[in-house]
């Protein structure tokens, strides 16, 4: 399976000067000690699934995140299945036989230099992405001719708390300028047309756009919601941003482990 990936390391560099609790602390951004950053996922699509392990860098350092090799990585589920991951390249660990399923609870265990980090995520029920359309209002900002916005269309199931993350690929390249994470707190049971806002310079007529919709659990949503605030991206850009996002990974690591469903559509921008 093509790695969908979470790609949150770049957002972590501006957070690496704080500890894992919610209290704001002041540290020297140039000399903050590196922290382990773990990105992992299990989906309802066919495996293999990937766990990436890096170390954070100081705020003013180059965006070269040292890979953590030689870690022991295992993912298990609530039915007794367990998969020990293989390191295929520095810091990249992949599963062998694990198959994700909606409703399953998955536990990630990572051991680095005798320190063990654990995380747990339950995969929600699948919600299908029905279609992707475009809103072209014209009169783009800064004199641009186009102001094209992608819209994800789907029906939210009633009576259930649902959380969604959207990942976009433009002409095969993942769009990483924004974080798209939403809850159904105000839209429960409704037909949703979700605007996926981005700077108008990123979409042009004729581009091939793929939109993947993830159904994520509440802890993963909280992580990306807070990360978008802290990094000034996405729909949750507020002045009262937390110093660092609350992660579902224990023992002081940064990052997130997500078990989620995937529903995707590929369309040509018009």
Region roles according to the model:
Residues 10-14:
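Hydrophobic helical h-region of N-terminal Sec-dependent signal peptides
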Residues 22-270:
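A sequence/structural signal for flexible, mid-protein segments enriched
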């Amino acid at each position: 399976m093509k790695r969908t990936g979470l790609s949150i390391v770049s957002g972590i560099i501006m957070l690496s000067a704080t500890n894992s609790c919610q209290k704001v602390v002041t540290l020297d951004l140039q000399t903050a000690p590196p922290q382990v950053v773990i990105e992992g996922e299990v989906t309802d699509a066919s495996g293999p699934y990937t766990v990436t392990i890096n170390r954070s860098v100081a705020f003013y350092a180059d965006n070269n995140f040292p890979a953590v090799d030689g870690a022991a990585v295992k993912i298990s589920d609530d039915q007794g299945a367990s998969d020990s991951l293989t390191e295929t390249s520095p810091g990249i660990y992949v599963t062998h036989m694990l198959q994700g399923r909606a409703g399953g609870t998955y536990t990630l265990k990572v051991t680095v230099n005798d320190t063990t980090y654990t995380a747990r995520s339950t995969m929600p029920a699948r919600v299908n992405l029905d279609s992707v359309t475009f809103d072209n209002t014209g009169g783009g900002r800064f004199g641009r001719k186009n102001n094209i916005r992608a819209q994800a269309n789907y029906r939210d199931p009633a009576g259930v708390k649902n959380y969604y993350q959207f990942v976009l690929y433009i002409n095969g390249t993942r769009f990483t300028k924004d974080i798209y994470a939403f809850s159904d707190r105000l839209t429960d049971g409704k037909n949703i047309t979700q605007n996926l806002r981005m700077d108008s310079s990123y979409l042009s007529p004729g581009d091939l756009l793929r939109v993947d919709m993830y159904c994520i659990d509440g802890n993963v949503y909280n992580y990306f919601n807070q990360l978008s605030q802290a990094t000034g991206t996405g729909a949750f850009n507020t002045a009262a941003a937390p110093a660092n996002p609350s992660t579902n990974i224990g023992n002081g690591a940064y990052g997130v482990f997500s078990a989620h469903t995937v529903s995707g559509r590929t369309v040509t921008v018009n």
